Curated annotation (Swiss-Prot):
This is Large ribosomal subunit protein uL11. Forms part of the ribosomal stalk which helps the ribosome interact with GTP-bound translation factors. One of its GO terms (cellular component) is cytosolic large ribosomal subunit. Keywords: Methylation, Ribonucleoprotein, Ribosomal protein, RNA-binding, rRNA-binding. GO terms for molecular function: large ribosomal subunit rRNA binding; structural constituent of ribosome. Belongs to the universal ribosomal protein uL11 family. One or more lysine residues are methylated.
Length: 140
């Protein structure tokens, strides 16, 4: 018989830097799971991606055990890294903070493809291009 799911918690944590301090401690502690066990396992799994934010979806079961999956970094972070900026535009419709090429857009779309609701790479590119536009990043 399958275990009964108690909760699903979604967190965005810097890769390799999970610790029991907020926001991880309170989010997981209220469900009674081993926070240090999660932190160690997360840090091992994301050690190769240090410096990026990696979302994790933690499934917590009634017997206080847990499983988690890591996803690809947020599209906004990948776009900021590709454009070489620290933040998007405050007024994206009026000011452009950076320009990225179609090649960079395709590269980001291929990385994000498994997490996006797109049938093909062109659909994924359009989704990422919309995110870029809302951040004030122009695609040429």
């Amino acid at each position: 018989m399958a275990k009964k799911v108690k909760a699903i918690v979604k967190l965005q944590i810097p890769a390799g830097k999970a610790n029991p301090a907020p926001p991880i401690g309170p989010a997981l502690g209220q469900h009674g799971i081993n926070i240090m066990g999660f932190c160690k396992e997360y840090n091992e799994r994301t050690a190769s991606m240090v410096g990026t934010i990696v979302p994790a979806e933690i499934t917590i079961y009634d017997d206080r055990s847990f499983t988690f999956i890591t996803k690809t970094p947020p599209a906004a972070d990948l776009l900021k890294k590709a454009a070489g900026v620290t933040s998007g535009s405050g007024t994206p419709s009026k000011s452009v903070v950076a320009v990225i090429s179609k090649g960079q857009l395709r590269e980001i779309a291929s990385v994000k493809m498994k997490d996006l609701n797109a049938v093909n790479i062109e659909g994924a590119e359009r989704i990422i291009e919309g995110t870029a536009r809302s951040m004030g990043i122009k695609v040429e």
